[in-house]
Amino acid sequence: MVLKQAASAIALLLMSSIAIAQQPPDAVRVRGTIESKDHQLLNVKGRDGEILKVKLANDAPIRAVVKVPLSDVKTGSFVGITAMPQPDGTQKAVEIHIFPEAMRGTGEGHRSWDLMPTSTMTNATVTTQVASNNGNTLVLKYKDGEKTFQVPPNVTVVTYAPAAPTELRPGVKVFTAAAKKLPDGTLEATNITVGRNGINPPM
């Protein structure tokens, strides 16, 4: 039974990584709090206060983010870092999400990101770690480049875990990077991330 549950969890995370990697270029990102739920339809209050209708696609993977310590980031870890570009060419980490091994390679690369003005997202492998009193320095390498990150001691660090549909309930904060706008204005999500234990998905 335990092995079967573990296999199911790995399969779910693999489905999630495939869905992220295959998101269309016009995908809409949704960040907000669930106001109500009606089967597959979620009413989500966005950061600007607008109520968004988010419909989960059939078999859309649901995953949770859970807080972990910065020490869980290891050399060789595949991570995503939201960051702000610095004048010296480095990036200052705003948050770090550690991908499980089953999701290695998800969205690999460096790109602009809409969490904050001028913020970036880098999904890559940690190749170097240097600790100091003011925080850590991480070097991340992806297929066609690398970036250096300054990591404050209090940075938010999370990882992913499979989640049940029952975790999608009013008051819970959610995020999806892969929603498609339908003709009626509804957003169809091919995957969704829920903040477990009151966490706001930081990406």
What positions do the PLM features span?
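Short, flexible, surface-exposed loop segments at domain boundaries
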Residues: A19-M203
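Bacterial N-terminal signal peptides
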Residues: S8-S17
